[in-house]
Amino acid sequence: MNQLVIQLIQLYKKIISPLLPPACRFTPTCSEYTIQAFRECGFFQAIQLSAWRILRCNPLSQGFEDPLPPNTKRTNLTHGRQTK
């Protein structure tokens, strides 16, 4: 499911985004942040992180460097190790 969302975002970046003026106030951009979240997190956590990020990206925000929080990597619950 995560891979499907990533492909949809990449399609948006290739087809729709070039038609719009640059608007993201953050580094990395909201689409790059969302792709990273879906690569490194579970589906529901990635949705939550991405939605919160997009809500913060508005004209009232100054914007700044905003990477994924450090403790967002998927964890294998049976062994406690990080998985990719």
From Swiss-Prot:
Originating organism: Leptospira borgpetersenii serovar Hardjo-bovis (strain JB197)
Pfam families per record: YidD (PF01809)
Entry keywords, A to Z: Cell inner membrane, Cell membrane, Membrane
Chain segments carrying region Disordered: 61-84
Protein name: Putative membrane protein insertion efficiency factor
Keyword flag Membrane: yes
Cited PANTHER family: MEMBRANE PROTEIN INSERTION EFFICIENCY FACTOR-RELATED
Origin organism lineage: Bacteria, Pseudomonadati, Spirochaetota, Spirochaetia, Leptospirales
Role noted for this protein: Could be involved in insertion of integral membrane proteins into the membrane.
Cellular compartments annotated: Cell inner membrane
Membrane topology of the entry: Peripheral membrane protein
InterPro entries found in the cross-reference section: Membr_insert_effic_factor_YidD (IPR002696)
Feature: compositional bias, Polar residues: 72-84
Family affiliation: Belongs to the UPF0161 family.
GO CC term, one of those recorded: plasma membrane
